[in-house]
Amino acid sequence: MNAAKVLEDLKRRFPNEPEYHQAVEEVLSTIEEEYNKHPEFDKVNLIERLCIPDRVYQFRVTWMDDKGNIQTNMGYRVQHNNAIGPYKGGIRFHSSVNLGILKFLAFEQTFKNSLTTLPMGGGKGGSDFSPRGKSNAEVMHFCQAFMLELWRHIGPETDVPAGDIGVGGREVGFMFGMYKKLAHEFTGVLTGKGREFGGSLIRPEATGYGNIYFLLEMLKTRNIDIAGKTCLVSGSGNVAQYTVEKLIQLGAKVVTMSDSDGYIYDPDGIDREKLDYIMELKNLYRGRIREYAEKYGCKYVAGARPWNEKADIALPSATQNEINGDDAKVLIANGVFAVSEGANMPSTPEAIRVFQEAKILYAPGKAANAGGVSVSGLEMTQNSIKLSWSQEEVDEKLKSIMKNIHEACVQYGTEPDGYINYVKGANVAGFMKVAKAMMAQGIV
């Protein structure tokens, strides 16, 4: 395989999809050496088959707002690869959603799900609809209209969506209710459900908790204790909230959180009481993070991200490409020695190069934030056997999965000088499992 040639061909065939191109380039550049040890892969054009989704559904979503006006949005579902299990990946509702972003997310999801060792393929879906500023009734009407098309393409053994940005328990509940009505069956077709109707304990916390469990494994490789360390967290949604919660439990000091308008810097640290306020502000009132600064009298910086502040550890938990090369240099200059990604692809290629050249601990999202989909997989298992596990059981399984992912990254990513290239390790480990499954199943 010539990675540059494969990427050039994909850009020609699928122009105007920069996030998708970026994700493919990052993976190909790290697996090329291992791939070329297997000439049998090229004989069946494996890499092209793996880069291009199995299928893409694109549809119009028509719904009525509270004023009686008819609105239209675009809906999508990218079913990328099901070589190792049913398609599995979240649904994102955000004004920035387009096909290129969802193809990147589905591509990444394929390798992330492979890393968990659970039987899940990769997919992703969503819409350019944004729940922000919408009433509860409007969100329900949209979710029902969205599921009116999506339901025919998903199923517990076919494709199992979950939440993502803009899609929390409320939205999953609305979509599940509509699916149940259309399909005339109660089944585990969505994960992230409420506990009352098939959801799993620890699922809301899983991505944030899992990221910290992975971070702890990384820190062990350098004999570093997380207690007392100053942490920068971006975002204030589900992932960021539970990242902060686990950090507080472990004795770390979190000084930032953010949203799309700006970030807060609290030098005293965000404690349990302050985090409870943020959770209520964001989850119940759909408020803005600046209200935290007004309540607690700390610094608020509008229109910026929190990467200029001094800290030991950075945990980007908001969105893709939120850390660029210049941000990465500032983080290192300000003392950051570990970056663990809670969001999907939050660091640009230039930022990743800066981190790796500085030899700091850097964990890509496909490894570090795999906790969310791992517990989604555990929710699927509980649904299939019609049982619920305790919080302790699920949490222990999550810790074990994140430890195993870390071990796989170390196995495939340790370089001659001893530095662990977690990007390479995650990509090669995830790729090899999918590649072997595809080879065994023939040309399909």
Residue ranges of model-derived segments:
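Adenosine-phosphate binding glycine-rich loop
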Residues: 1-23, 218, 317, 332-444
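Flexible, glycine/charged-enriched surface loops at secondary-structure junctions
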Residues: 21, 37-44, 117, 154-163, ...
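Structured beta-strand/loop patches that form or line metal/cofactor-binding pockets in enzymes
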Residues: 40-71
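Phosphate-interaction motifs
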Residues: 59-120, 124, 128
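Glycine/serine-rich phosphate-binding loop and adjoining beta1-alpha1 elements at the start
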Residues: 94, 113-227
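Glycine-rich phosphate/diphosphate-binding loop of Rossmann-like nucleotide-binding domains
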Residues: 191-194, 199-310
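Rossmann-like adenosine-cofactor binding region
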Residues: 262-362, 367
